[in-house]
Every structure is written in C-alpha cells, then in structure tokens.
Amino acid sequence: MICLGIEGTAEKCGIGIVDSDGNILATCGCQLYPEVGGIHPREAANFHAEHIVPLIREALEESNLSINDIDLVSFAKGPGLGPALRTVATAARSLSQNIGVPLIGVNHCIGHVEIGKLTTGAKDPLTLYTSGGNTQIISYESGRYRIIGETLDIAIGNCLDQFSRDIGLGHPGGPIVEKHAENTNKTIELPYVVKGMDLSFSGILTSAINKYKQGVDLDVICNSFQQTCFAMLCEVTERAISYTGKNEVLLCGGVAANSKLRQMLQVMCEDHYVDFYMPPMKYCGDNGSMIARVGLLSYDENKCGIENSYINPKYRTDQVEVTWIKDNFQHNINLPDNIKEKGAEADIIEGIWDEREVIIKHRVKKKYRVDKLDEKLRLERTKEEAKLLSDCKKYGVTTPYIYSIDLNRKDIILEKIDAPKLHEIINTDKDIKKIFTNIGEMVFKMHEGEIIHGDLTTANILIKDDKPIFIDFGLGKYSNLLEDKGTDLLVFKKSLNTIIPEKSEELFNYFLNGYDNEDVIKKIDEIEKRGRYL
C-alpha cells in the first residue's frame, strides 16, 4: 500500500509519499515566512491552499509515481491552527474522492515520533518533542503514547520565536537566536523552572526580553537563553529516563534542528548510559512523510471516510489509541557496578558510614549545563533537600534520617531503608486503597507545613507497613501557594497515568480521599489545561 500524506498544521506545508514497507518515496514542502510578526492562521491557510497541489505534483514526480498509484490519503487533523487544518482536510477529502481511495486523519505529534522511529531504528524510545506549538516528553505505555512531561505555559519553539520578534529580530526565532549564541561563551543568570517532569518558559522569556531592554549584550542574552532553556529540556528528559527506565531517547520536532540542543542531549544520554537518536534534518520539522507513515500504521477501514475527517485543533498525543505497536519491550540500562541506581540528578550508592549501612546520594556534575549554573543548582538543591527531609518530620511525615552532608561533593548520606517503591507494589495483594489514602493524608500534612515535594512520583515514595516514606526532595521548596501544591498533585497524577493508566483514576481518587483541601484539588484541572495545545 502507498500513502500520500498532507501536513499543514502551522506555517509549513508538506506532502510525503510512503509505502507499507517503510520506504519514504518522496518528501516535499515549503514554509510561510511572514513579513512581520508571527504566523497568522488565515495567512497559513491561504499559503497551504496555494501550495498543496503543486507540492503533490512535485512529490509524484520525485517518487516516479502517478496519482493512480496512491492507495490511501492521510492528513494531519491536529493539533494545529484551525484555518490551516481546515484547508488541509478539505484538500485531503477532495483528493481521496477524486481518485477513489480511503481517507484517514492522524495526529501530528505522533507523526513526529513515528517518522523518528522509522528513520533512526529506535524501537521504544522516550521522545522529547520540541516544536513551535508543543514541548512534550512522550513515552509509549499500555496502548497509547503518554505525555509524562510537558510545558505548563508556552512551547520552546514559541518561546524562541516570541523573544526574537519582541526584540525586532524577526521570525522564525530559533535559527536567529542560535546564530547570535554562537558568537560568545559568556552567560548570565536567567530563571530556571523545572517542576517534576514539567517545565515553564514564560519566566525566562520575560527575563530575557527585560535584559535586552536593559542593554545587556544580545549575543550573551541569546547564549544564556539557549543554554538555560535547553538545560531544562535535558533535565526533564533525564528525569523521565530515570522514571520509565527506557534506554533510548529520540529528539524530534522543529527545534531539534538546533545544534546546541542536539549536543547537550547527546552528552546527557551518554552520562545516563542510554542511546540517543535523532531523525535526518528533513524529517525533524513538520513534513508530509510523517503523516503518510502514521496513516499507514493506523489504517483501519472503520476509521476512514469523510464522516471521520473532522479536524481537532487541540488533538492531544495521549488521545490516540495506538493499535499498531504489539511488542512488549524490555529495557536494560547497564550501570557501573558501584552505582545502585542512576537518578535524574544523582547517583545512588550503597555505603558504610559510622558502621551503618547507608545510602549516599551524590549529585553528579551535569556536563550539559554551563559550570556556573550547574554548581548553583547542585549546591542549592543539596542544602534545600536536607532541610526539607528534616522538616517533614515536624509534621508527622516519614522521611529517611540524614547522617551527614558534604556540600563540597554535593552528597547527602541517608538512612538505608529496605522497602519497595510505590510502583513496585501497586499490582500486589496489598491494601492499595488504604495505602493511597495514607499517601494523600501525608502529602496534605506536608503541604500544611508549606513543604512542596517537587517531584512527587511513584518512584519517590517507599511503602513500609502500608505507610509511605517520602524520598528525593531535589526539586522541593517551601511554599504556601495553591499553584505549587496543585502542581505537586498533578505530577503525582501524571506518574500514575504513565505506569498504570487503566487504574490511574481510581488510585488517584483514593489519594484524594486522604488529601483534605478542595481548593488545591480544583487547582489541578486549571494547571493541567495549560498544557493543552494552543
């Protein structure tokens, strides 16, 4: 079967032709460059209307095929700009009817993942998807691509574009910022915001624009802007590696064209003993071949036809039932013998201290971060974590005892506790309702004491005698804001949805039974909606 795919979710218009053996027969495309400002949805729609037919002709010529050789037409139904999506869907309907072949709409984001897997050979990667409209950490789990981390406000691509536009450099901003950043090694401090496996770019955007207005050198701002944003992306990705245990990382999306981001992710992956993949540059950005590929993978006669060809501008990656992945993948990361676990920001090492068996949490230097930022983060987090672990006990929340702290090495020497992690006992015969209610009660106490865990996942809660023991406060802080408490709960909710999606709602409700604050619970939905594609 041969599929022709039509892409046009934003400013890029693309046609791709792919066959069912995975051969990419043609990839053709063009891009709208606005004279001023960003992408206007109607301008994008008009641009696509003008270029789709010529690009189809070009793709057929490149593939040495005629239009009658096409067996299936697929199109990007979302997420994206409404007017642009409608133009693409109209073109796809017309083409499929004219040549008498099935029509199927597909998810744009999953297209990036699948073309990446096809062109790199990655089997079951953790995917960092970075584009103008999306920033997501994606993992295939239990029949869907799950979003285990994402931006809580604007996407990295939009962040770069908006900075460039606001200071008068034009659009698209990514290549412009990258070019200026290459002119210097100097950096300044900018906001660094990571919340579990989620992140936020609005603060750093505002700060960078203000620095420019204050007269700070443009090259220095651009280098700092890139280094800080990309370090945040690397950190949430390594947190996801630690949580999922996957041994492959795939970078995709338009921002993957940035050489500094690729370099930083490569370094991070090497330090975590996992493989790094990135598709050829022509398949990083939006393209028709990724739409054709997903069209073939998801082809189902019952899902085809004009009646199913509606668009969805807010089409989430995790809304799609992934029926084409059948394998049950096993992952193995080969760690050095002296490392018990490789955490996101620390090596976990077993040792002896004062004739006691202990756990040494050693915050290792992050080679992907600039030295000054890395030293600051590791020192601050080591001191803050030690204080939070100790203060939790004031509110009846169980944490490991601290025996010693070495701020020079960024080490915390902790009580060794022989107990399974929460995700290891979820499918056992233990009283799960009681356990999750207990966790909710303890997190409520923590929050009443104005302690925010910061990375509240099932990997950071030990269970002993049906009671929780909280570990790893590396992203923790003191706060009484509903926003921070709600984010804590959202991180926990997402972690459940990743590891046990079929029971996640039930388990989270048990948790909420113990968490006695309706205002915080209501805040979860508000924060969650910000991650939707806009």
From Swiss-Prot:
Its EC number is 2.3.1.234, 2.7.11.1. GO terms for biological process: tRNA threonylcarbamoyladenosine modification. Residues 1-324 are annotated as: Kae1. Residues 335-534 form the Protein kinase domain. Pfam families: RIO1, TsaD. SUPFAM superfamilies: Actin-like ATPase domain, Protein kinase-like (PK-like). Gene3D superfamilies: 3.30.420.40, Phosphorylase Kinase, domain 1, Transferase(Phosphotransferase) domain 1. Signal peptide: none annotated. It catalyses: L-seryl-[protein] + ATP = O-phospho-L-seryl-[protein] + ADP + H(+); L-threonyl-[protein] + ATP = O-phospho-L-threonyl-[protein] + ADP + H(+); L-threonylcarbamoyladenylate + adenosine(37) in tRNA = N(6)-L-threonylcarbamoyladenosine(37) in tRNA + AMP + H(+). Keywords: Acyltransferase, ATP-binding, Cytoplasm, Iron, Kinase, Metal-binding, Multifunctional enzyme, Nucleotide-binding, Serine/threonine-protein kinase, Transferase, tRNA processing. InterPro entries: ATPase_NBD, Bud32, Gcp-like_dom, KAE1/TsaD, Kae1_archaea_euk, Kinase-like_dom_sf, Prot_kinase_dom, RIO_dom. Binds 1 Fe(2+) ion per subunit. Coiled coil: none annotated. It comes from the Archaea. Fe cation binds at residues 108, 112, 129, 286. L-threonylcarbamoyladenylate binds at residues 129-133, 161, 174, 178, 258. The active site is at 455 (proton acceptor). ATP binds at residues 340-348, 361. Component of the KEOPS complex that consists of Kae1, Bud32, Cgi121 and Pcc1; the whole complex dimerizes. In the N-terminal section; belongs to the KAE1 / TsaD family. In the C-terminal section; belongs to the protein kinase superfamily. Tyr protein kinase family. BUD32 subfamily. Required for the formation of a threonylcarbamoyl group on adenosine at position 37 (t(6)A37) in tRNAs that read codons beginning with adenine. Is a component of the KEOPS complex that is probably involved in the transfer of the threonylcarbamoyl moiety of threonylcarbamoyl-AMP (TC-AMP) to the N6 group of A37. The Kae1 domain likely plays a direct catalytic role in this reaction. The Bud32 domain probably displays kinase activity that regulates Kae1 function. HAMAP family: Kae1, Kae1_Bud32_arch. This is Probable bifunctional tRNA threonylcarbamoyladenosine biosynthesis protein. It comes from Methanosphaera stadtmanae (strain ATCC 43021 / DSM 3091 / JCM 11832 / MCB-3). The lineage of its organism: Archaea, Methanobacteriati, Methanobacteriota, Methanomada group, Methanobacteria.
